Amino acid sequence: MAKLSLRNVQKTYAGSVQVVHGIDMEIADGEFIVIVGPSGCGKSTLLRMVAGLETITGGEIHIGDKVVNNLEPAERDIAMVFQNYALYPHMSVYDNMAYGLKIRGMAKAEIAQRVNHAAGILELAPLLDRKPRQLSGGQRQRVAMGRAIVREPAVFLFDEPLSNLDAKLRVQMRLELKELHRRLGTTSLYVTHDQVEAMTLADRMMVLNAGRVEQIGTPLEVYSRPASTFVAGFIGSPPMNLIPVARNAGGDTGAQMRVVAKEGEAANATLGHLPMGLHLPEQALLGLRPEHIEPCAAHEAIAEVDVRVVEALGADSFAYGSLGGQAVVVRLDSHAHVRAGDRLPVTSSAEHLHFFAPDTGKRIEA
């Protein structure tokens, strides 16, 4: 195991197209880090630079105490698990897991010990004589992970390993990955576009957008205090509501705010008590998680939501509607009697209000 350091890491392609912009991160020995972001944000490129499959055009990558920029992948003491398994179809499960050790010249007894140990961890022991075509998708992915485990690397790299699995298998494999990391304690860097995977697996997560770091933190920190409107809209399902607001006429900094209605709409919403010490500009974006917009009695309401659609999902329901013409989502108790066409009185607590600068999208702190 080893710590992993990314220091001003950059990637520029021919024609001065920069796709990774000066990324810095210190990853502790044994930490599980998830890089999450939309397609094309640079997350797989960053992972491939750590692996040695892409050249680095700026900065340094340290694995342990070594700068690995110019080392071949085989010299970096890493093991990588890919999205598409990359198994040899003519080889058995045992031989797929053992192949990398064989070409390194390891003794047969040591290979057998490592393969059998990994197979026991991953519940693959009964399948060691099978070919990949005889396995389910989840079993194939476990073989790919077993092939990485037998190398006993300093760092595991995962490139969207669950993307090819169906929804039920993804949940199962998430749990298995979490348990595997708990048992092995190996430093891990995991790439995904799926924010649920990021939230459930990560010790800390890095949110990437267009090759730049938007935020680094624990899943709870990122969810509870998003650093930008991008993070607020990307992390969470449904995402955070973002509503334009303005200071009431005549109010000074920190005064009441009102929702800015779309033309021809009446917002009828004034935010009463803003968080202490919060200084807001004339215009801002208000962020509210769907679970923090609470249905209430009419006399307690700060706004009314015009409900268009209600989705019943069992334990929860979601009401999709508008507030002054601005789209909002409200999470409801499954027993709430709300229907399309209702005007739903709602309120919220000051500690659940988030504010962002409309020009930069950055969080406004108290």
UniProtKB/Swiss-Prot annotation:
Does this entry carry the keyword Membrane?
Answer: yes
Q: Where in the cell is it found?
A: Cell inner membrane
Q: Where is the ABC transporter domain?
A: 4-235
Query: Where along this sequence does the record place binding of ATP?
Result: G37, P38, S39, G40, C41, G42, K43, S44
Q: Which of UniProt's keywords are assigned here?
A: ATP-binding, Cell inner membrane, Cell membrane, Membrane, Nucleotide-binding, Sugar transport, Translocase, Transport
**Domain of life of the native organism:** Bacteria
Which protein are we looking at? Answer: sn-glycerol-3-phosphate import ATP-binding protein UgpC
Catalytic activity annotation: sn-glycerol 3-phosphate(out) + ATP + H2O = sn-glycerol 3-phosphate(in) + ADP + phosphate + H(+)
Q: Does the keyword Metal-binding belong to this entry? A: no
Instruction: Give the matching InterPro entries.
Output: AAA+_ATPase (IPR003593), ABC_transporter-like_ATP-bd (IPR003439), ABC_transporter-like_CS (IPR017871), ABC_transpr_MalK-like (IPR015855), ABC_transpr_MalK/UgpC-like (IPR047641), Dihydroorotase_CS (IPR002195), Mo/tungstate-bd_C_term_dom (IPR008995), NA-bd_OB-fold (IPR012340)
Name the predominant localization: membrane
Question: Which EC number applies?
Answer: 7.6.2.10
